[in-house]
């Protein structure tokens, strides 16, 4: 589990706050996405690449995670940091990610290719926060099938994305978790209004 998620980006249904220690000051930010190896965050603090920062955050109801990190990228107020963690903080981060995915409060979207076919796999919450990544995979990368076996919670905005994929892009809806299968069956009875959440038409 640890190795599989080391570089997978986890997005949250509700933005998670983070406290940042830098240059003797404490500032605030918001986590954009999280992996075992680091995170992306937005903050007004003037962080500099290659400098060290202290990161303190919790993921929903997780214990407080306090980990040092190095700033590795910046685009405007969006910073990427790589954790300099020990085994305890790594376990805390993995446990927090696992709990958030199981509850549907966090999501992973990944694309895998096998035998010339591309499969989009969604784990955790099928929600509107995935729209940008979902549509990029659908329209830029080309997807043949969507694997939803790992979905633990479903939002209407997420169902709308799947309807657009199936009806307008002829993508196959593959493996399904019980909660997705139930919501999908209901969505298929009246797909029009849901699709409008994505297309506006």
Residue ranges and their predicted role:
Residues 1-34, 91-108, 112-116, 127:
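N-terminal helix initiation/capping motif
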Residues 57-63:
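Short, charged beta-turn/beta-strand-edge "cap" motif at the junction between a beta-strand
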Residues 51-57, 91-102, 133-134, 139-140:
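Extended Gly/Ser/Thr-rich low-complexity repeat segments
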